[in-house]
């Protein structure tokens, strides 16, 4: 979904229930954006 152009300009919400892993999940999302 993150890379599908149909979702350009649509804000996405990151839902992470455990705040202890927020940094890890944000880092993973950033790595996916660089692909």
UniProtKB/Swiss-Prot annotation:
Annotated positions binding Zn(2+): 15
What top-tier enzyme class does this entry carry? hydrolase
EC number, UniProt record: 3.1.21.2
Keyword annotations from UniProtKB, A to Z: DNA damage, DNA repair, Endonuclease, Hydrolase, Metal-binding, Nuclease, Zinc
Cysteines engaged in disulfide bonds, as pairs? none
In this entry, which stretches build a coiled coil? none
Q: Please report which protein family the annotation says this sequence is part of.
A: Belongs to the AP endonuclease 2 family.
Protein's name in the database: Probable endonuclease 4
């Amino acid at each position: 979904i993150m890379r599908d152009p149909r979702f350009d300009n649509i804000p996405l919400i990151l839902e992470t229930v455990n705040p202890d892993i927020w940094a890890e999940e944000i880092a993973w999302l950033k790595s996916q954006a660089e692909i």
